[in-house]
Structure formats: structure tokens, C-alpha cells
């Protein structure tokens, strides 16, 4: 069942400062409060109103391209009894487990740990894996990078004393806190040359425990074969931008395998590459659609079919997408004007979000 006891008695929703330490913000932030390309938070109402119109009696929901988890979280908020959510990127999986995954956690224990971290004097910290790879005025200023690395190492030290849920919560707190101060436009493909360092603050998150959530980590085309759901919501990568590269840094912080990184922008040797961001996208989509066991398929895409910038041009054309989906049932299309978050790299005008609605035969 849902645990809604979020707030800690005696802690006001404001920064608890410790002089030269790290401020602790006790106002909880939500799963969608993260910079991420394709984040559907602002589209949730529109998406679920369209779902309600045709499938108002549905009780199960599957999101095999979960991203931040904002859509899966909204499905839970709207009363779906069973929610399946999947992604391939470790940072997203850690977030799902922290924010919506089942499990027990102790609020006071989490806050005690945060307040101990709040006493850290960053100037006293030694160099570590994070500062060596992501500090030195690149993704983070040097002292912030040292603090991130120290805290991540401390989570591993504390792990024997934590429940699995508490472990994920602490990592998610670090993940969302560092995202607020990263010296980037929102992805971690590269860092800004003009420094805009902000004060690093530890921010409490809003964890819930749902028994009806099932979390997967794998290729959407593989995991979908074992799932039966009233609704399958598809939000595949639209264009050539590879999420495995864009979010390699948070993945490395979450996994903490201390892999040797390469290049000026400090990347793994082999980041995950999605076929949906290549010329194979249509073939992958057709394969996925044929494997789905559901009553309804809702597919998000946008209208960047002829964009001048190849990086944001859709890999699957409108007619091709419609043809693929129509093989499983009658398909209609809803549309909404929408300017997506794109990390500031490309100016997009006249953008519309599309929702393909397929009633499976």
C-alpha cells in the first residue's frame, strides 16, 4: 500500500544550514523534478485525459520506456492498481526504486543521515573518483565534486545498515541534488565552458511505497514479452540523441563501479546505444508492437519529421508510425502544441506532441 508519511516532525521545509557545511532542504522534491530530455511531466494531464476518454476502466499500466518515471508515477496517482515500468539506464532504475518501488524505509533514519552530511566541510575532503573525473571546473566545481564522491562512498559504507529502499532513497537524493548544480544545460554529454556554479544543497525527495509496482531493467523489446497489461504506453527515443551517452554521468554515480572513463567529457567506453535512435527504429518498433499483450497502446511521438537539424529529426515517419500501429488495431491521433525541453541545443518552432491511440484487435 501507499506510504504517505513524507514529512518529519520537527523539521520545517527550509534549508538547515551548518555554516561552511552543506545546506539540507527538507521540502521533498518529486520524481519529475529532474532535467531530462523527453520528460513528459507537462504533458501528463493531456496524456491521461486521452486515456480516460477511451479506457477509463483500465487498472494496469505498462511503461517500457520509463525515462524519469514521471508517467508511471502519474499512473499511480490516478489509481492504476498495477504499474510496470522499465528502462535501460541505471540512474532511472535507481530513481524508480527510490520514489515508487515497494519496500520499507525509516524517515528519521534518512533525515539523520542527511543532517550528518550537512555538517561536512567540503574543504576538508580528499580527492575521489567523482572529483577526479567530474570536478576540476568541468561538470561540477572541485569542492562540490568532492562532496558528491564522499557522500556516494558513504552510502556504500552505510549499506549494511540500510533497507534496500533506504539505499535507493539516499542515492536518489544525491542524484537529484547534484542535477540542480551540474554545470550543464541539462544533459551530461558535455559541460559548459562558461561556469555557472550554484551552491550544492542536499534535497529530501518524496518516496512512496507501492506494492503494485513492478520495475524492470532491460531492452523494451525483450521485457514486453512477459507482461500483460490493459494499457501499454510507449515513449521511445524520437531522434538520434543517445540517452546512454547523455546521462552516462548519473549512471556512473549510481552504479559506483569506478570504471575508467575516456575523453575530455569523461564517458564509459561502451555506453548503451538504442536502436530506436538509428535507422533501425522502424524495424524495432514493428517488432515491439507485435509482442505487446494489451487492450490499448498509446504512443507518444512529435512532429519533427522534417527538421533541418538531423539531431532532432524523427527516426520514424508519420505514415510509417501509423502503418506500424495500425497492424494491431484501429489507430487515431491526438495532437497538442508543445515546446519540449531539449537542453538548449536546438531551437524548435511549431512543435506538436502526438499521441497515437490504438485499440488492439
Which positions does each model-derived feature cover?
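Class I S-adenosyl-L-methionine
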Residues: 315-361
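Conserved Class I SAM-dependent methyltransferase catalytic core
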Residues: 274-330
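S-adenosyl-L-methionine
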Residues: 2-60, 70-78
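Conserved SAM/SAH-binding loop
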Residues: 217-222
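Conserved proline-anchored active-site loop of SAM-dependent methyltransferases
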Residues: 61-75, 85-89, 175, 225-246, ...
Amino acid at each position: 500500500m501507499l506510504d504517505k508519511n513524507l514529512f518529519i516532525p520537527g523539521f520545517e521545509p527550509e534549508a538547515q544550514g551548518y555554516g561552511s557545511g552543506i545546506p539540507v532542504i527538507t521540502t521533498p522534491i518529486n520524481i519529475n523534478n529532474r532535467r531530462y530530455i523527453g520528460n513528459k511531466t507537462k504533458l501528463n494531464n493531456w496524456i491521461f485525459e486521452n486515456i480516460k476518454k477511451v479506457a477509463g476502466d483500465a487498472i494496469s499500466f505498462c511503461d517500457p520506456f520509463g525515462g524519469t518515471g514521471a508517467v508511471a508515477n502519474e499512473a499511480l496517482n490516478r489509481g492504476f492498481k498495477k504499474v510496470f515500468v522499465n528502462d535501460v539506464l541505471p540512474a532511472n532504475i535507481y530513481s524508480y526504486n527510490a520514489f515508487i518501488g515497494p519496500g520499507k524505509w525509516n524517515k528519521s533514519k534518512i533525515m539523520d543521515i542527511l543532517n550528518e552530511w550537512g555538517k561536512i566541510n567540503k574543504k576538508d575532503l580528499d580527492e575521489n573518483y567523482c572529483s577526479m573525473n567530474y570536478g576540476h571546473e568541468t561538470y561540477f566545481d572541485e569542492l562540490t565534486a568532492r562532496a558528491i564522491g564522499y557522500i556516494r562512498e558513504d552510502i556504500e559504507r552505510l549499506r549494511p545498515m540500510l533497507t534496500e529502499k533506504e539505499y535507493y532513497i539516499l542515492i536518489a537524493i544525491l542524484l537529484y541534488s547534484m542535477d540542480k548544480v551540474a554545470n550543464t544545460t541539462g544533459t551530461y554529454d558535455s559541460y559548459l565552458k562558461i561556469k555557472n556554479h550554484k551552491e550544492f544543497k542536499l534535497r529530501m525527495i518524496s518516496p512512496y511505497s507501492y506494492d503494485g509496482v513492478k520495475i524492470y531493467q532491460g531492452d523494451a523489446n525483450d521485457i514486453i514479452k512477459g507482461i500483460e497489461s490493459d494499457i501499454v504506453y510507449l515513449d521511445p527515443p524520437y531522434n538520434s540523441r543517445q540517452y546512454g551517452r547523455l546521462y552516462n554521468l548519473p549512471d556512473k554515480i549510481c552504479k559506483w563501479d569506478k570504471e575508467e572513463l575516456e575523453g575530455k567529457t569523461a564517458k564509459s567506453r561502451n555506453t548503451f546505444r538504442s536502436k530506436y535512435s538509428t535507422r533501425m527504429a522502424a524495424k524495432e518498433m514493428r517488432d515491439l508492437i507485435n509482442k505487446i499483450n494489451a487492450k490499448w497502446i498509446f504512443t507518444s511521438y512529435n512532429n519533427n519529421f522534417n527538421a533541418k537539424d538531423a539531431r532532432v529529426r524523427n527516426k520514424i515517419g508519420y505514415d510509417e508510425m501509423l502503418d506500424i500501429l495500425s497492424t494491431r488495431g484501429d489507430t487515431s491521433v491526438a495532437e497538442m502544441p508543445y515546446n519540449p525541453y531539449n537542453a538548449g541545443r536546438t531551437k524548435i518552432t511549431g512543435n506538436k506532441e502526438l499521441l497515437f491511440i490504438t485499440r488492439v484487435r
